[in-house]
Amino acid sequence: MKKYMLILFSYGGLKKINKHLKKKLKANDKLYVRAVMLEKVPKLFDHLISDVGFLGEKVVSDVEDSVVDICQDNAKDYLKEANELAGSMNFELDQSLIKEHNLEDLKQEVKKFDLDGIFINFSQNEFVSNQVKEEEIKNWLQKIKLPQTIFYDGKLEK
C-alpha cells in the first residue's frame, strides 16, 4: 500500500488531475486530500473589486462573498468527486478542508503520514500563488526529498 497526498490550492483543471490519479493510484493505496478553502477574497480579486468602488460597499461586499462562495463550493464539489473516484478504484481516502492556509499544519501532516509522494495543484495566477507561499512550499518539499508532482490549474509542470 502506498500513501499519497493531494493538496489543492487551485480548483482549475481537476479532471486532468483525476486522470493522473487514476494512472498513479492502485487498489488499497491511500490518498489524503487537503483542499484549501478561501475564507476571504484573494488579494488579486480584492484589488479588482476595490477598483469598482463606484458600485458601493454593499455591492463590493456581495461580490466578495460570491467569489468566496464559488471557491468553497468548488472545494466541496471536488471532495465529493474524490469520494466517487476512491469508491470506483478501491483506494482509501482521507480528506479535509483547510479553512485557513496554515503551512505548518500541512508540514506536520506530510511528516506524520510517511508519504510515498505528493501532488499539488497551484494556481497559475501569480497573486494567488504568492498568497499560498508556493516557493516556500516547493523549497520545503525539496529539503525532505519527497517525490512530488506539481500542477498549475491542472496542467502538469514540466
Q: What annotation goes with each model-predicted range?
A:
Residues E57-N74:
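A short acidic, glycine-rich active-site loop
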Residues E84-G117:
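Structural beta-alpha unit
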